[in-house]
């Protein structure tokens, strides 16, 4: 019996600690899915201007005619009726790129803003540069990323040395344009 006593004590202590951790998380967990964080608010103001913003939790109830797609994190609506999508896409970093794509009523891109990026400083983080993000404003339809100077209206130039991150931003914009085209925008 004495040879099993340390095992039993260790198992009991581990079980008690695990239960305490579970209880602590249950009492202190805050669901942030309906909250506009400071970083998201900054991105909203950059892309859509000053104003009041709210997250739309139920797209059908709001009258958009579709359910929230899996590739969209949040739909943010400004009090003037304009909307933006928060989209997390793959970049070079495993954490991805958290992007905000604001849309014009005609379905073109109003502005693109970076909520957060954890890519290589000086390379992947260059997708935050205003010159790169400005390429997307006014664009409609699916965009293609090119390494050289764009020759067509549906092309945007990648950031040199940050192809993965540039591809991620372009993917986020393409997702936003596609989802916006499916929305019933009558409200």
Predicted regions and their residues:
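Flexible, solvent-exposed loop/hinge segments and secondary-structure transition points
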Residues: 2-187
């Amino acid at each position: 019996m004495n040879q099993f006593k340390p095992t039993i004590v260790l198992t009991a202590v581990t079980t008690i600690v695990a239960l305490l951790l579970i209880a602590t998380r249950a009492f202190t967990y805050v669901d942030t899915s309906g909250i506009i964080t400071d970083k998201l608010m900054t991105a909203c103001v950059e892309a859509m201007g000053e104003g009041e913003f709210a997250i739309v939790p139920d797209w059908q109830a709001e009258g958009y005619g579709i359910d929230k797609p899996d590739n969209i994190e949040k739909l943010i609506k400004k009090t003037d009726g304009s909307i933006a999508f928060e989209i997390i896409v793959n970049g070079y970093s495993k954490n991805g790129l958290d992007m905000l794509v604001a849309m014009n009523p005609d379905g073109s891109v109003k502005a693109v803003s970076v909520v957060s990026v954890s890519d290589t400083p000086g390379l992947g983080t260059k997708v935050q540069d205003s010159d790169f993000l400005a390429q997307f404003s006014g664009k409609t339809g699916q965009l293609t990323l090119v390494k050289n100077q764009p020759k067509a209206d549906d092309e945007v130039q990648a950031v040199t040395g940050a192809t993965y991150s540039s591809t991620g931003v372009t993917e986020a914009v393409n997702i936003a344009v596609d989802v916006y085209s499916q929305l019933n925008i009558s409200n």
